[in-house]
């Protein structure tokens, strides 16, 4: 899934689960793997891959700032969002003009059974996942 989907899912996980960070942080990484199993569309196979990656990163960074500064997300939710999204930074690194393009997270390896779908259905799948996470956040995030 795109970086933004992993970020919002991590926010929801950190907001919903009231457990130790020792449990929550590994759970956020596990959530990343589970979301990558769901059939979805990845921009990694398009000619415009760098622009999709830059846009995804910019949208995710802006979302993080808004959630931190204006929506009052807890530190746990913010941390869990970052941990869940962090493995996708190797996707961003892979589109930069660098020699090093190692994909270090297991769900990004060619041997991983990554869920795949066409562009329209795959984007809808991710939008649906984000919508579920936003609904969960609405139920679990304390009002300001």
Region locations from a protein language model:
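N-terminal membrane-targeting hydrophobic helices
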Residues: 1-144
């Amino acid at each position: 899934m795109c970086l933004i989907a992993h970020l919002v899912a991590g926010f929801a996980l950190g907001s919903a689960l009231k457990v130790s960070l020792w449990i929550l942080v590994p759970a956020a990484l596990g959530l990343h793997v589970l979301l990558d199993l769901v059939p979805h569309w990845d921009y990694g196979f398009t000619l415009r891959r760098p622009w999709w990656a830059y846009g995804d990163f910019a949208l995710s960074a802006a979302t993080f700032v808004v959630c931190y500064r204006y929506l009052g997300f807890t530190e746990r939710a913010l941390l869990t969002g970052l941990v869940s999204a962090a493995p996708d930074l190797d996707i961003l690194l892979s589109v930069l003009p660098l020699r090093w393009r190692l994909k270090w997270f297991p769900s990004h390896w060619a041997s991983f059974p990554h869920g795949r779908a066409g562009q329209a259905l795959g984007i809808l799948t991710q939008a649906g996942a984000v919508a579920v996470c936003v609904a969960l956040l609405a139920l679990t995030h304390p009002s300001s």
